Amino acid sequence: MMLTLAGAALLLLGASGPSPSTHVALSAEFVPPARAGASAHVAVTLSPRDADVRVNEEPAPRLKLEADEPVLVDKQAPATRSSSFDPQNARYLDPALPVHFPVAVKPTAPRGKQTVKARVTYFYCSKREGWCRKGTDDVEFAVDVR
């Protein structure tokens, strides 16, 4: 019994942040501005692992950079309040298209290739099984600061 409690304590202490979703796989990449004056963004692809699972358009997915992020600054508009969720009229994201989150490179960002960490929050549903859940996953991507 003591070994089981010690093992459980180690598992709890070792857990830092959310565990990845078993229903949706995420990947992220930094997309620099296409031309001078244009905006940079982080493109996040949310790929359901089960054909029945869909990622909701509303409430819209959100990207949150780490508080002490030295490379990027978030340029997203503030989150808006959504009306109550209606599963019968829900709209879903196309899994083939990434969601774009506007960002800018900080003028004080260190030069060279930098790894940026962020957290993505989204909502997804299974129509067949009749449930909806909130997903929160960590992503990492490279930014080449010139």
Label the predicted regions:
Residues 16-146:
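Extracellular/lumen-exposed scaffold segments
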Residues 2-14:
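Bacterial N-terminal signal peptides
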